[in-house]
Amino acid sequence: GPLAYNLDKEFGTGATHYITRERDERIYGLGDKGGSVNKAGRRFRIDTADSMGFDAAMTDPLYKHTPFYICQNSVGCYGIFYDTTAPGEMDLGREINNYSPPFKYYRSAEDCLVYYVFFGSKLEILQQFCRTVGRQPLPPKWSFDYCASTMAYTDAPKSEEKMDAFLAKVRALDL
């Protein structure tokens, strides 16, 4: 579809990339985001926050974000990766404007955007994305061992005794 840019700062500072939105879109990605897997119709901050006690359905932003998504509709699939670490906003159909056809946009705090567009099946798009940004190396075996975190341990009565008993059980199970 047609693309448009905020070159004259009509919509404020930073850069904005608009794309025509199809009504049957399913959108997947963006990293650590709450809610359903299909992100169509939502708006997200592209930023990080320490969101302890978050609501898994609605809290945004969370700990990690990736300004990359895959869009699937009746025409096919494409992926877009915005190559930036700057804070931003991704609107995937939340905003509706009576004077414009359906659209989605990515707005970045940077004055220019660098982005990559991938075409193919969802698997092919993910493979292209991984070749572009690099793959995560396989972590060492020990990193798959048992791990837990909670603030409750520090305030529990006899916390050291409870932790020692817990660790003994974990060792007995070879975790």
Q: What residues fall within each predicted segment?
A:
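Catalytic and substrate-binding clefts that recognize carbohydrates or anionic sugar/phosphate headgroups
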Residues: G1-S143, C147-T154, S159-E161, L167-A172
